[in-house]
UniProtKB/Swiss-Prot annotation:
Coiled coil: none
CDD domains: PseudoU_synth_EcTruA
Entries under Pfam families matching the protein: PseudoU_synth_1 (PF01416)
Designated name of the protein: tRNA pseudouridine synthase A
Length: 249
């Protein structure tokens, strides 16, 4: 068997997430169906580096899968790209070592989160940016977001009921830009890993701080007390994008 690594992008609106699940349309299953056709009907399992939720998008999701024999990677990419549904794009395919695992190989991830703060909102972007209808002081967000950078226990920003034992992660980039033309906020987070719904919970908290309903020092308190109840609401998934995954050599 030969192992292949692929970078894919997808519009998450019509998917129930990346991971295969009963009676639901998922990115994993769509790609597996195409690979089965390309593999003479033999089953193929696709592994993903990140398990995006329903409605979450990706520019740079990484997957891997095994096929019998060696194939021309550009022909394989083209076949996957043209035979998989139109809301999935196969950006690249390469052959990798048999022990490469896209999820467990050491890597960093970058997420973006788009927030529409326009008045009126942009209805064409309703599936691709989260609308926030309340007033914001962007200087408060810019001040608070810096407290997320560094190595912390992010228990206070993860969803309840998760089975992960170690909630310590390192965030290397946490920033916000204002796109004045589109009236969008663009949040960017890079790090060595993120907990379940961590990015959406961080954004929800930052928006509440910007609206003045939480103090600017709230993030420090959440990190110190590890209490999800101190954080803001979970921002909707439609504004979240898995932008890039970079593997260490």
């Amino acid at each position: 068997m030969t192992r292949y690594k692929a970078i894919i992008s997808y519009d998450g609106h019509d998917f129930s997430g990346f991971q295969r699940q009963p009676h639901a349309r998922t990115v994993q299953e769509e790609i597996e169906k195409t690979l089965v056709r390309l593999n003479s009907g033999q089953p193929v399992t696709v592994h993903g580096a990140g398990r995006t939720d329903a409605g979450v998008h990706a520019y740079g999701q990484v997957i891997h899968f095994d096929l019998a024999g060696s194939r021309d990677v550009e022909k394989l990419r083209f076949a996957l790209d043209t035979q998989t549904s139109e809301d999935i794009d196969v950006v690249s395919v390469e052959q990798v070592a048999d022990d490469f695992h896209c999820r467990y190989a050491k890597h960093s991830k970058t997420y973006e989160f788009l927030v529409d703060i326009g008045r009126p909102k942009n209805p064409m972007m309703r599936h691709y940016a989260t609308f926030y209808p309340y007033d914001l002081d962007l200087s408060l967000i810019e001040e608070a977001i810096q407290d997320l950078v560094g190595t912390h226990d992010f228990t206070g920003f993860t969803a309840s009921g998760t089975s992960v034992e170690d909630n310590v992660r390192t965030i290397t980039v946490a920033s916000m830009e204002y796109d004045q033309q589109r009236q969008f906020l663009i949040f960017t987070f890079s790090g060595n890993g993120f907990l379940y719904k961590q990015v959406r919970n961080m954004v929800g908290t930052l928006l509440k701080i910007g609206n003045g309903r939480m103090p600017v020092g709230q993030i420090k308190r959440i990190l110190a007390e590890k209490d999800r109840g101190l954080a803001g609401p979970t921002a909707a998934g439609n504004g979240l994008y898995l932008k890039e995954i970079i593997y260490e050599d």
